[in-house]
Amino acid sequence: TKLVVCLHASNVCGTVMPAQEIGDFCKEHGLLFILDTAQTAGTINIDMEKCHIDALAFTGHKGLRGPQGTGGFLIRNKLAAQIEPLISGGTGSASHSEEVPAFLPDRFEPGTPNIPGILGLHAALCDLEKQSMEEIRQHELMLTQYFIDGILNLDPEEKFLRIIGKKNIENRCAVVSVQTLHMDMAQAAFELDSTYGIMTRVGLHCAPNAHKTLGTYPEGTLRFSFGPENTKQELDIALD
């Protein structure tokens, strides 16, 4: 084993992984550590040095609130030097060479970049910098606990709605997955969207193995997620 790759938080059940402990383990055993922060970038502070992270991947369209189709990764030079580019092509630099440039970021950015998406992500990051990440996190966790409590108040024995994962906000992000036990989940998602304008994500969430571990395969779950602009009033509509 040379490399450990893990997500920072599950996009299915919301559990946040102990990045510090994993990083310490990797350093102790001489392992490279790559962290996928798709679900946490912009909402949970991450110290790459403290957690001994060699590469950190992120998407722009979730917690960073940028356009879809944007994302990137932060990578240490020692790891970058060991990786062959997945795609090669022109970069607009070192055009005299038949080889992809060895320097960053050009080595991993062939072709024409998604400039509109990058500018949109930049605008989103500028807006994000005006806010406190901790305040965003606490607001999202408040909504998460409020929603979980609301489900349990409606269905204490979970006979109709089963919450997947923890029922508190300890080591959690703002994702709540449920299973509808007496209604097709795709139909429930459709009605939430078409009747109430509530967008959810239904199915296996590109994470079939997570669903197998959680016992929700092959049906999957109906997932709700909350952001800094959401309110308790909106959650009340969903709960009703």
Residue ranges of model-derived segments:
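Pyridoxal 5′-phosphate
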Residues: 1-240
